[in-house]
């Protein structure tokens, strides 16, 4: 029988083995302080399952988009400290990012110990899925565990390339849970079924979106994704980000699913993220010198009303640049509305 999830592995195949766990610790950090550790906490069951069975656990993640440069503000060291608190035990951290330095750290790991590698995207080879880099990562471990659901679609070295070198490759509990949930929503969602899509790019979500939009009763769109749809409708979006290569698909979707797709009716905008003092709330049309960075209060109210009394909700991607307080309101309000809906019995 194929081994699909980490719990399918016999304890004998875990004890003493080096388990490389790809996680998603892309969390908001400012001045070394993590403002939201939800993504870290969600990986704890997988990590503890492995350590309780004597594995030597190697955690790896990205943080931000350093594009192959070492940027101190994008170091994962604060994550290792928070992880130590959550696990109640020390978590090692690889200061030395060279292959020899990393290997020396891992060779020194004892059973049930955990180490976190430095930001993988400090290496350009990670996002390039460079074969030798993939092979080097694979040489560090005996088992590959993918528990990074949010980045599993990316063809990077740590999410794709290195996995090809393992006989033992399985999903962690987080990925397994999300896949089960997606399968249920795809095959037999409870209705009314609401899909909420945010984040920066459509193309990162296109496969899931195409499947879910067919099943959904309503699709609420925010984040950077919304500006491609708004531009496709001929609405002035100022300097907001768009994906021009997705414009035709967005136009077709708006026609095909008319009445099902909801777009922001107002925005929190500014001249730039650096010039947040210029922050204003504008209606659907955004002035040329401004960029949209969050959904506005009218949109928040509208979307919350659409979330109430639903059978199932699928949410992927923030409503704005939530890492910055000035543009976090939309994401926070939607998160609270979904939490309330979940408490009332909605499948989320």
Model-derived segments and spans:
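Active-site loop-to-helix "anion-binding N-cap" substructures in soluble metabolic enzymes
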Residues: 1-348
């Amino acid at each position: 029988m194929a081994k699909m999830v980490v719990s399918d592995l016999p304890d004998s195949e875990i004890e003493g083995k080096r388990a490389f766990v790809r996680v998603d610790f892309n969390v908001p950090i400012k001045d070394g302080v993590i403002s939201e550790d939800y993504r870290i906490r969600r990986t704890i069951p997988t990590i503890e399952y492995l350590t309780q069975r004597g594995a030597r656990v190697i955690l790896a993640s990205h943080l931000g988009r350093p594009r192959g440069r070492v940027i101190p503000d994008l170091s994962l060291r604060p994550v290792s400290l928070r992880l130590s608190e959550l696990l109640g035990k020390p978590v090692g951290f690889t200061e030395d990012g060279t292959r020899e330095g990393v290997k020396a750290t891992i060779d020194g790991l004892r059973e049930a110990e955990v180490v976190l590698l430095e930001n993988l995207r400090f290496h350009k080879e990670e996002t390039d899925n460079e074969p030798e880099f993939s092979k080097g990562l694979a040489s560090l471990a005996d088992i590959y565990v993918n528990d990074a659901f949010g980045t599993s679609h990316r063809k990077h070295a740590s999410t794709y390339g290195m996995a090809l070198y393992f006989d033992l490759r399985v999903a962690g509990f987080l990925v397994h849970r999300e896949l089960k949930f997606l399968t249920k929503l795809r095959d037999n969602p409870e209705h009314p079924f609401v899909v909420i899509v945010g984040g920066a790019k459509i193309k990162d979500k296109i496969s899931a979106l195409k499947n879910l939009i067919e099943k959904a009763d309503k699709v609420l769109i925010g984040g950077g994704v919304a500006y491609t749809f708004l531009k496709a409708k001929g609405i002035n979006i100022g300097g907001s980000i768009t994906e021009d290569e997705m414009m035709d698909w967005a136009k077709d979707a708006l026609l095909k699913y008319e009445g099902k797709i909801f777009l922001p009716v107002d925005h929190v905008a500014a001249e730039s993220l650096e010039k947040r003092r210029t922050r204003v709330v504008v209606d659907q049309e955004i002035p040329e010198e401004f960029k949209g960075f969050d959904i506005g209060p009218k949109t928040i109210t509208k979307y919350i009303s659409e979330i109430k009394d639903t059978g199932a909700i699928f949410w992927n991607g923030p409503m704005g640049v939530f890492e910055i307080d000035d543009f976090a309101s939309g994401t926070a309000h939607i998160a609270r509305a979904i939490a309330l809906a979940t408490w009332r019995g909605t499948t989320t």
